[in-house]
Amino acid sequence: MSKLSDRIIQVLIRKDVSIHAQLFRFMSLLGTIAMAVGGVYTLAEGMEIKNVAALFAGALFMGMLFWAGNKFQQYDLCSFILMSGLNGIFLPVTFLRSGGLKSGMPLWFVLGFISLFFLLRGKSLVAGTVITIIADAYCFYTAYVHPERITYMESESVVYVDIIVSAVITIFLTCAFMFI
């Protein structure tokens, strides 16, 4: 098992590539694993098949980005695609389907916004920031003006667990970004 972890660390943390490339590798690999595990969990819980399909499609997409970044050394482009997909599509859809403001989703929005500044630079950072602000504003507008479009969680205890889990993951990932 230690050989596998050593190999993963060698792939993620390499001194021959930029810090942006290392962060991209970390985020895309971790995202691939997290979405695949989420897909298996969602399938095991018997939730809607479209949620399972979305998680597996997201895992495949992030895995392909990880592969393309490593293969073609286009880390800036792959990072922009990753952040645009995360902040412009995945997080807003998840916000609408997972409780909106009455969940841990606002913490994920913060993580998505912070990640922009770790991964992007120059015009990509400006474009990513604009995409993120528009997507977040749309979500908050929808939650305020059309709360009926939000799928809320079934109980208050589930909301609290979601907020705690989101806080722990957000803190862990932010610290990990700073470590790399």
Model-derived segments and spans:
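Alpha-helical transmembrane segments and their interfaces in multipass membrane proteins
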Residues: 14-17, 36-60, 73-77, 97-103, ...
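Generic transmembrane alpha-helix motif of multi-pass integral membrane proteins
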Residues: 63-68, 89-100, 109-124
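Membrane-embedded alpha-helical segments in integral membrane proteins
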Residues: 30-45, 65, 90-91
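N-terminal membrane topogenic signal
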Residues: 13-28
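Short, Lys/Arg-rich, polar N-terminal cytosolic tail immediately upstream
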Residues: 1-17
